[in-house]
């Protein structure tokens, strides 16, 4: 019986580090962000719908989607953001499900769905267990400023656009505290996976 793990966290909480640790343990990871990029490639159904709704001004000269431009259009406009989500989310969900079923058929011990907005997008029904990667608020802010070269104001706005991390922690089956070293994070992950009978 394959255990489907939903991996999530706050922005800049170090989720990709944990995602990589799963891969090193030979546990397949289905990454929602990668799929979200693939489903809007030129010629795909979601791409065509986006151009229909948002017009050609969200395209680059080569006809591919200009993601930063589209991002700035929807970031400050709730209605447009919801329109975009209505196009992209079903396409992402369908592709994640397709890959998940493939790994289940292969008889994998576990498969990870790496979904940054697992709770916000109401996708918990896709998974059996939820693992949240958490950090202290100050760590999160500093990491995001450094990683994306954001001002404190920009970083705070991005963090506040998501469900608060402490709320995600409350809803999790297990939590990894990612304030420490990589080794400490790895140890926590291994303990959780042993408790879930996924690794020996």
Curated annotation (Swiss-Prot):
Location of the DPCK domain: 4-200
PROSITE patterns attached to this UniProt entry: DPCK (PS51219)
Any one of the GO BP annotations: coenzyme A biosynthetic process
Positions annotated to bind ATP: 12-17
Entry keyword annotation includes Glycoprotein: no
A Pfam family hit: CoaE
A GO term from the CC aspect: cytoplasm
Pathway info: Cofactor biosynthesis; coenzyme A biosynthesis; CoA from (R)-pantothenate: step 5/5
Job of this protein: Catalyzes the phosphorylation of the 3'-hydroxyl group of dephosphocoenzyme A to form coenzyme A.
Protein name: Dephospho-CoA kinase
Organism: Bacillus cereus (strain ATCC 10987 / NRS 248)
Recorded name of the encoding gene: coaE
